[in-house]
Amino acid sequence: IHEQIISNSGEAVETFLSGIVINHMGYCLNDDERKVKAERNIKLLVNRLDELKTMSQESEEQEIPYILYQLGKSYYMEKEYVKACDYFSKGLSYDLDTKLEYVIDMVETYGYAMLNSGAEKEAMSFVNIYDEFGDSADFKFLMGLIYMKNGLFDNAVKEFKKAVLYESCKVEGVNSYQAYYNIGVIYECLGYNDKALEYYERCGDYENAQNRVAYIKNN
């Protein structure tokens, strides 16, 4: 279902940013197609997980957290966030290399699943893993959302401002217009319309920000 590129020797290799852009169309689906694909994936992943649980080889057991991660992603794609959280939690209970891309993505998607399932208070536990996973725009933006959902607006603004200092990110806009927009929302909610306008106007042609600018200027 999901492929991971490794070296022929199995050893770690040096990587670099090539500047090449590859468009992956596998998830450019409508809701019905996405649901069918997710259900197919879940069935195959559960079967594989059951197989792995009967094996004792270390190499096979090391695959279990990755399967749990993919199950979590599949349920997340179906917007079944509570189930996604359950699989992410199980996957992260293993002793994992925190530098692996799938582990980083599992942590970040777990955070979004918690927020989407109404578990924002539980998501505050991410403060405890900040030192391990916090060196990216994506994680800092996520922490901004977690603080924002918990009403810790000063902390949220600080995290969003940290996110825009990064040149690259995985999710579009978390190091630019999305972060600025959320800062604007916070300032507007607190009644600081001048500050809100300042950050909304940094969002460029982001429609949501433009709508807020128009509303503030006309009221």
Regions found by a protein language model. Give the residues of each.
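"A position-specific structural signal for the A-helix of alpha-solenoid helical repeats
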Residues: Q70, T109, L142, K149, ...
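Catalytic-site signature of metal-activated, phosphate-bearing donor transferases
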Residues: I1-K79, K83
